[in-house]
Amino acid sequence: MNATALARNLIRQLIEFGVSDFVLSPGSRNAPLSIALHEAESAGLINLYVKIDERGAAFFALGISKASDNYVAVICTSGTAAANYHPAALEAYHSENKLLIITADRPARLRQTGANQTTLQDGLLAPLDTVDIASAIVISDRLREGPVHFNVQFDEPLLPADEGDWLKGLAPHPKYRNSAREAVSIEVKPRGLLIVGHDRAGFEVGSISKLARDLSWPLIAEDPLSFPQAISHASLFFSDPELRSTFKPEQIIVIGRTTLSRSINALISECSDVIVIDPRTERIDIKREASQILTSLPEVIASPDSDWLAKWNQLSEFAQKNISLEWSEQLVISTITKNLPNDSALFIGSSRPIRDVEAFAAPRTGVHTFANRGLAGIDGNISTAFGIAERYQRTFAILGDVTFLHDISALANPTSADLTIFVIDNDGGGIFSTLPQAKVEGFEKIFGTPHHLDLERVIAGFGGVVTRVKSASDLIHSIIHPSQGLKFVVIEVPDRLTNADKLKEVTQSLVSALRMGSNLA
């Protein structure tokens, strides 16, 4: 089978399967795929995006996949181009996102011969398995769960010898949906606690909310923007061992990965009866202490204790009333998340922003939240936000300045969607000032990493629309009066050391207030 026929066969099958979004990086060896994709786009069958940087292209595709829950294909030429997909491939693997990576390759006979732009691409994106393709295959049984790597061998000639009517009669089939998992039934204790990780183990918010109602237990959510009944600021006040002891549950159900808060993980570790629910192959039970592991949301046999739930709800209300924030990164997060419009999307950058959302955002609904929590990296965050924005009328992103600069090349090929990116400018890696590393010698050089850049000028250099804000009122104005298209809001906050001190003060003040409430602790 020649290169043109092989490429057309693959693209035709993908379209029939329901793949509608393709992200292409230009190259020579992937020319058969590039030409086939252009023809499919011209026929109105697919959405084709072209990104020159493979690393950013993969994260862009990952963003579309996160927002659509459908396979999105990303295509490149051979050699180092393929290696640039590895960060996004790892994130997709650990998040089980539907990312289809297609790398073009030379024929197998040219491997390890010194042929130009040729390396061993089979296994290049481990732990992803590689499907090495030299002739037509049936792809439908390959696209089931999580990311997939197709490595396609193209021999010369790479250009079509005829026009061909290969798209005639082509129609997408219904998109693949995950098969339902058999529900189990479990008996639960009256004084329990439901804890939901940010990724929710892939379960729908509505399904988890139903489980919470059936349990009649309090709920702690790493994503408070999806669960209005969540206990407010729990990760802050449960840093206190006395409060953890006072509110110690008889049983905990954990859904997904809880990776943001040491205090919540301490609460889990101190409970003798923990049930973990996660359908993925990597079980989310870091200390191997779970008494039971389930792969689906169970039916529950419950004997609710109304006093237990009321006690927790009272705690949550008291926490909301007794948290006081000055202008800081914490107030920035609280202000943004409170004022986001309904039915908008929010991408939350790794490191400090996602932890502050978990700790300081008031529980609410109406916001579709996304984050790269598979490996929690700071790379590719702008590109991921660009991809998510392709699927929503209004999208927002919150990034730290180092995270922003790490993917700055994405601005060379920006999205045209309505996206506002908030950049928290504290001149360096703010999270390290809140960790034990803050006290080591040489901290600023090896952890703080100040960049000393004028981010407004950097963004303007890419032709971006940018404003700088220094107050909550200006920040609110930038949210409720957004301009169309891509917009950047650089947020000037106190220095990193001051922010770390404010975080300690807020936490200690809240803990003291809750401990003094005689009816709460």
Question: Where are the regions that the model predicts?
Answer:
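Conformationally flexible catalytic loops at phosphate/diphosphate-handling active centers
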Residues: 29, 125, 139-190
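Phosphate/pyrophosphate-binding active-site segments
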Residues: 1-2, 267-354, 466-521
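A short, small-residue-rich loop immediately preceding and capping a beta-strand
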Residues: 20-24, 46-49, 67-103, 248-256, ...
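Glycine-rich, acidic loop regions that bind phosphate or pyrophosphate groups
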Residues: 92, 101-137, 220-316, 414-416, ...
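Thiamine diphosphate
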Residues: 92, 102, 109-125, 361-521
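N-terminal cofactor/phosphate-binding cores enriched in small/glycine residues
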Residues: 4-75, 81-83, 360
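Glycine-rich, anion-gripping cofactor-binding loops and their flanking helix/strand elements
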Residues: 62, 66-67, 78, 84, ...
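Active-site diphosphate/adenylate-binding microenvironment
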Residues: 7-15, 28-29, 33-37, 313-392
